[in-house]
């Protein structure tokens, strides 16, 4: 059982009452977390019990409420690592398929499984250069070998890859993609998807709407064409390119660049960072260029552009100080 602290993202029974969750979920929460619980602890318990039908809603709530928190990326990485740990013995080799409790046990000696109707599989692999094509819903996949590839079209799947140079291609909605290895490549066209990458030199391409994208290490490159995206790039020497409308882009690493041709909702720069933002003056498209440390642009502060294309600092509610 985990008791929340001020440093951790947490959830309480009062939060669940405000969300009007189902009776079964509320009772489950009271049983395991009567005093509230941290994001990591609650997520781990859901994974342990294979409560896949609740995981996506829980993650959506956490992202909507806490994505902009300074500690979010660190806690999200902890959650990703817990998924890998909870799926079984780390020393186990090969491919493991595990059915949920209400299914019959499948043979585990086969390296390839084909399915047209089985959903909610638990799949773990530590082999190298493994390719997986997934079309079911509510599955949990964890790959830890190098140069693995995951292709997914199913909804509400949890896709984790910790190996070097892993590739994930996703078209399913409401999925979650986690990549902890360096030089990974992620391509997504699904909507309402959460993408987290913590390796160096990752490339992420997104065209889905209402997605959350986090890249926490250096030399990341993120390209987004989807509307209503929230992008958080914290590594140094990174680049975020956006063409979607009503997006929020944060490139808080040192010497990083934000380029946007879409109708940008907010932007934020790090030390030595710069932003190139397009706007229409009524006759043609023009560009405004902003540099951290010049014209009042402060690292770590979110800005939006007023009708004259001047940057205005966005002050969060409940803020006690203004820079």
Model-assigned labels for residue ranges:
Residues 1-323:
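Short, glycine-biased loop/turn motifs at secondary-structure junctions and
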């Amino acid at each position: 059982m985990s008791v929340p602290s001020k440093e951790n993202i947490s959830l309480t029974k009062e939060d669940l009452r405000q969300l009007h969750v189902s009776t079964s979920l509320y009772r489950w929460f009271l049983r395991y977390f009567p005093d509230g619980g941290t994001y990591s602890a609650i997520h781990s318990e859901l994974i342990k019990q294979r409560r896949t039908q609740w995981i996506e809603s829980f993650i959506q709530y956490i992202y909507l409420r806490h994505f902009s928190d300074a500690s979010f990326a660190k806690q999200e990485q902890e959650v990703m690592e817990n998924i890998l740990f909870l799926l079984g013995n780390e020393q186990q080799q090969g491919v493991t398929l595990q059915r949920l409790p209400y299914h019959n046990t499948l043979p585990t000696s086969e390296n390839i499984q084909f399915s047209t109707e089985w959903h909610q599989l638990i799949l773990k692999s530590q082999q190298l250069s493994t390719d997986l094509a997934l079309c079911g819903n509510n599955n949990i996949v964890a790959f830890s070998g190098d140069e693995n590839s995951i292709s997914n079209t199913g909804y509400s799947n949890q896709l984790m890859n910790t190996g070097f140079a892993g590739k994930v291609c996703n078209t399913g909605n409401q999925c979650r993609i986690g990549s902890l290895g360096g030089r990974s490549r992620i391509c997504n066209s699904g909507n309402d998807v959460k993408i987290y990458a913590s390796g160096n030199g990752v490339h992420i391409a997104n065209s889905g709407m209402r997605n959350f994208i986090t890249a926490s290490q250096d030399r990341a490159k993120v390209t987004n064409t989807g509307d209503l995206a929230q992008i958080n790039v914290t590594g140094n020497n990174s680049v975020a390119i956006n063409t979607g409308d009503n997006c929020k882009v944060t490139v808080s690493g040192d010497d990083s660049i934000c380029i946007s041709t879409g109708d940008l909702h907010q932007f934020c720069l790090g030390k030595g960072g710069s932003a190139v933002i397009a706007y229409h003056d009524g006759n043609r498209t023009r560009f405004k260029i902003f540099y951290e440390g010049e014209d009042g642009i402060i690292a770590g502060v979110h800005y939006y552009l007023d009708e004259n294309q001047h940057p205005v600092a966005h002050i969060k509610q409940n803020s006690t100080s203004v820079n």
